[in-house]
């Protein structure tokens, strides 16, 4: 079994899972459907969390008992949690800049690669954590170790397999610049991020949480991963990466401020800490990502494209459905700020006018008019 969810507290554990899953979906909808909701979620709340965490840090440095006994200091003091929450927030803010075309940066075509960059950074943070556990096994000879937060982790080849899977997963992201705003500005769309990537990512990331956050994986592994995936498959096609960033940031802030939910309440759920299970899950993650990258190479060769500069999933059902959600060019032109240059507008129009089915290998080339 993966988790200890069959004892006397099982009803609370399943209830807790349902609350997290539904809560994340609802919070994501609030954040994506309005600018105010997004600014509150990723502006006001992060500021409040930062002030709270800084106050605790100052208190700890001064030896204050209230700070030393604060749950955030006890359970969420590692480098990973702080790196993850702020990296996720950076992604959310960048995505809002793209979908709302905020400033010159938000309108720049080169900035559309920001989703790739920030997702890669988030993956590398997790890979670093997996390799940290592997170090305890290979360098220190430990098959288990206890983190600074009091969490027991397994250490071994499972971390190596999943760390490699994470690195491969970075290169499973295709069409880095093919990012658009949706018709209603609710979403930033990445049409080339189809089910192939989503499934490979979800398996890898679940395995990461199972390896390195075994006492949290019931929530941050299953509920947190399924919330954006369900939204993408049922009502927000093409918006998975935004769903993922939004729900991740919201969950990380909640976990940072209210860690007792996962640590000392009736909702606490631990993994079984079974080495065989952890290894099997890690091998599955590696196999899934190898399969994904092989399929991407196959499609790239079939279409004759560079899968990173151009789209690899042109002509697929998921790709077309996402492309059909793009904002109309006429609307984009109406809302272009006065500061937009003719070159910026021409590039935006060229990409936005591509057919929903896609154009294999398309790359915009600016045409300079002869001056007479």
What spans do the regions from the language model cover?
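An N-terminal, globular interaction/scaffold subdomain
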Residues: 2-102
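Hydrophobic cores of alpha-helical transmembrane segments in multi-pass inner/ER membrane proteins
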Residues: 16-24, 82-99, 161-176, 224-229, ...
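Juxtamembrane loop-transmembrane helix junctions in multi-pass integral membrane proteins
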Residues: 4-7, 75, 103-106, 149, ...
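Hydrophobic alpha-helical transmembrane segments and adjacent interfacial helices
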Residues: 44-66, 92-100, 116-133, 195-211, ...
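C-terminal transmembrane-bundle signature of multipass membrane proteins
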Residues: 21-25, 220-351, 361-363
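Generic multipass alpha-helical transmembrane bundles of integral membrane proteins
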Residues: 105-238
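Membrane-helix interface "capping/anchor" motifs
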Residues: 29-40, 100-110, 233-246
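Membrane-interfacial helical/loop segments at transmembrane boundaries in membrane proteins
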Residues: 1-2, 61-79, 132-154, 265-273
């Amino acid at each position: 079994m993966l988790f200890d969810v069959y004892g006397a507290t099982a009803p609370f554990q399943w209830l807790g899972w349902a609350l997290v899953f539904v809560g994340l979906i609802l919070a994501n909808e609030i954040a994506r459907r309005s600018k105010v909701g997004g600014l509150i979620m990723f502006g006001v709340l992060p500021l409040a969390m930062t002030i709270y965490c800084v106050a605790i840090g100052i208190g700890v440095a001064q030896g204050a008992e209230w700070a030393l006994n604060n749950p955030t200091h006890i359970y969420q003091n590692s480098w990973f949690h702080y790196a993850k929450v702020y990296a996720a927030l950076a992604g959310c803010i960048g995505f809002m800049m793209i979908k709302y075309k905020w400033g010159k940066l938000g309108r720049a075509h080169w900035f559309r690669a920001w989703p790739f960059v920030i997702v890669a950074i988030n993956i590398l943070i997790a890979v670093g954590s997996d390799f940290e556990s592997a170090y305890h096994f290979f360098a220190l000879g430990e098959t288990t170790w206890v983190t600074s937060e009091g969490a027991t982790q397994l250490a071994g080849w499972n971390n190596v397999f999943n760390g490699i899977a994470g690195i491969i997963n970075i290169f499973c992201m295709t069409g880095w610049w093919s990012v658009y705003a949706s018709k209603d500005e609710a979403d930033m769309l990445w049409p080339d991020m189809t089910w192939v990537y989503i499934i490979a990512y979800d398996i890898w990331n679940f395995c990461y949480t199972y390896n390195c956050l075994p006492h949290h994986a019931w929530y941050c592994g299953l509920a947190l991963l399924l919330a954006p995936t369900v939204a993408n498959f049922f009502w927000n096609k093409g918006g998975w990466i935004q769903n993922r960033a939004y729900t991740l940031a919201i969950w990380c802030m909640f976990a940072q401020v209210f860690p007792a939910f996962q640590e000392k309440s009736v909702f606490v759920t631990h993994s079984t800490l079974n080495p065989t299970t952890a290894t099997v899950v890690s091998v599955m993650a590696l196999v899934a990502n190898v399969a994904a990258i092989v399929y991407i190479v196959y499609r790239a060769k079939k279409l004759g494209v560079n899968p990173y500069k151009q789209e690899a999933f042109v002509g697929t059902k998921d790709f077309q459905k996402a492309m059909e959600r793009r904002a109309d060019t006429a609307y984009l032109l109406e809302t272009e700020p006065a500061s937009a240059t003719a070159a910026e507008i021409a590039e935006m129009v060229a990409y936005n006018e591509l057919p929903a089915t896609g154009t294999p290998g398309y790359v915009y080339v600016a045409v300079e008019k002869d001056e007479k």
